[in-house]
């Protein structure tokens, strides 16, 4: 209780609701940051801040964040960078290549891909030093529920994963059913093919709308006119995803 974290304001609405309401009831406080200038994260840091959370490709606005710059700020602060990569998928963007410490996905969307199942995944890079500065005692100090076992000392580069699985999963129960796991794995088999098609279709539609007299604006990072085009080419060289917004 009392811990804080920073989050980009450009997020999926369900995440914002969770951070503002559900997490607050648990005593975790989120401070939202305008990510258009990465230095805004540095300016918002406090001694109680334990993480930075972002969507590298924001849902649904088609906004691309400067992943490398935000990673550097998190590293300077000694806190993990958590990236929601749902919209980009591992096929289009590899956040760990740019220094992300934890990645989360809603598998319900592109990974599953067929509307058959709901779920989520958590991936740990194994490179973050949880013992540094004593900021994360729940991972680095003995756990009485496991006879004094210290997760980071025992499991090393997958200590966070083991803590999440053996404690959070056990106590709160967010376990995927076998059927949902099967459908998700089946969907992942066609992820590259599907994402290539999604990107190609999205570009065609975005270009059409961008040139239509009745359309006021289109926010899609794949367009040449997008202010996020360079960031998209850097972090998502295979395409800027398939979710975007436009106004009339």
Locations of regions flagged by a protein language model:
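Conserved PLP-enzyme active-site core in the AAT-like
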Residues: 1-211, 219, 230
